[in-house]
Amino acid sequence: MNHSRSHALFVQAQTRIPGGVNSPVRAFRSVGGEPFFVARADGPYLFDVDGHRYIDYVGSWGPMIVGHNHPAVREAVQVAISNGLSYGAPCAAEVTMAETIARLVPSCEMVRMVNSGTEATLSAIRLARGATGRNYIVKFEGCYHGHGDSFLVKGGSGMLTLGIPSSPGVPAELSKLTITLTYNDFDAATALFEEMGHHIAAVIVEPVIGNANCIPPQPGYLQHLRTLCTQYAVLLIFDEVMTGFRVALGGAQALYGVTPDLTTFGKIIGGGMPVGAYGGRRDLMQHIAPTGPIYQAGTLSGNPVAMAAGLAMLELIQAPDFYTHLSNAAAALCTGLQQAASQAGIAMTTQQIGGMFGLFFTDQQVETYAQATACNTDRFNRFFHAMLQRGVFFAPSAYEAGFISSAHSPNIIETTLEAARTAFQTIANEAAILSKSETPIKMR
């Protein structure tokens, strides 16, 4: 593929933008090479500035659940724009959005709009600390909750890719207030609560880890956290920035039947536009200004254009059997990829929850962060580039989940699998040649 225009843009970008990108994973540092620059997107496809088309399994990192540039979402945005871009004052759409979230996710009795998932999680832990009068926050290895200082402690996603346990610029004293546990370890959670449960303000968790690829909870694990939090009056926060409206209409909390005290959402509620929200029990949310003393604000919060896009998308995903079709498509993709890898003699495991999936280059199921980091990342990188050359775009990191949209038809899935069969066989052949070249010559 010729990527001359993308290359020129990347060179130019690096003179004005740190690393040439506005979010680290986009730079392809993990997989090698240079990123392509997108010109437009439609349905299941991305089109780059050099004229190449890609089947997209990143979906803007999750929110494009009905595909890119859906006519209903686009029309809603066009209508909203005709009335103005930003008001700095209340509008009807933000009320409708709050009502819609509360109806679809009953644990969110009240909702506050913000501008990103990071802003939502930062606001949620401030609320938790203010409401409980405690300072300690518990998170889990491999979970990523945005780039807030309290979360950059053994963070996942880009932090995993960069191999940095914390970030310069985060005060050591603040990091001490974040306790990190191993996800899916029942005993570790119990031991921590027995030791200092009465000092913990909140436990924040991705109910399905999406930032160390895709790691689901072990049976009963989320309920175990719920029980411990209730026993010690600790707030349980589900970070559903990735799983919200993605793994089920009511999010992971509906799928697993566990009710958190607070929930955070990200860009999916804006149909892909910059937006976030956090919600929860009424008694907790009333601590937020102006009804309470805990301050949080934002000029663009509840932006009318983002609300319009999000409401249109939320309407579409309530169609009958929407999630059944989404899950079936993801299952077909994962089963096909697993079979293609196996036929080529390549160890790979897939894990899938609803329309969210992960590819692990290992022969074992992955339950923890440590197991995710032990996978063969070099082989993933080879697979990533082999698929990209064949017009299929997976996340440019071995530690990121993939996403299916309703625009991924059976034909799109089969096209992907055809590319994968060729890619896996190519990788297997390369490995065989390398192995043969490294075989020592016997001396007589």
Curated annotation (Swiss-Prot):
GO terms for biological process: protoporphyrinogen IX biosynthetic process. Its cofactor is pyridoxal 5'-phosphate. One of its GO terms (cellular component) is cytoplasm. It holds the Pfam family Aminotran_3. It is found in: Cytoplasm. Homodimer. This is Glutamate-1-semialdehyde 2,1-aminomutase. It comes from Xylella fastidiosa (strain Temecula1 / ATCC 700964).
